[in-house]
């Protein structure tokens, strides 16, 4: 099972304040433990929302672009992990070990696997080009 762990940072981080080196060391130790256990698939930190944009769609289906920063900082994702584990309980156990250096909360979401969808959805989603791209990305991530 794959899970995405979304990290919601403190207001300081959203304002662009960098963490102190000790906090980074603690987070890297956690990341190394994830990697050694074979659970780490991917991770990244994100720039503050001031460098981003939000795209929503109006009732007519027209995209509306709003440049950051976003005032609702509790809704801003500051980073993520993708982990692969056997159960949700194992994923929760990993999340409880995340150093609280900058994270004010994390959200754990299971990632859909193609086999989670009904056969007709799998067939509709089958695209040789997309499948080849995903396989190439997964192969490069393993090397």
Residue ranges and their predicted role:
Residues 1-143:
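Conserved, structured core segments of small domains
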């Amino acid at each position: 099972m794959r899970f995405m762990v979304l990290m919601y940072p403190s207001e300081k981080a959203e304002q662009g304040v960098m963490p102190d080196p000790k906090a980074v060391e603690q987070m890297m130790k956690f990341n190394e433990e994830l990697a050694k256990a074979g659970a780490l698939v991917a991770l990244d930190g994100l720039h503050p929302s001031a460098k981003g944009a939000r795209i929503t769609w109006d009732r007519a289906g027209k995209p509306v672009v709003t440049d950051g920063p976003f005032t609702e900082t509790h809704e801003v994702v500051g980073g993520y992990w993708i982990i692969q584990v056997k159960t949700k309980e194992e994923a929760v156990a990993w999340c409880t070990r995340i150093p609280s250096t900058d994270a004010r909360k994390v959200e754990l979401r299971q990632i859909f696997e193609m086999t989670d969808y009904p056969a007709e959805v799998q067939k509709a989603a089958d695209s040789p080009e997309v499948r080849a791209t995903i396989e190439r990305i997964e192969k490069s991530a393993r090397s």
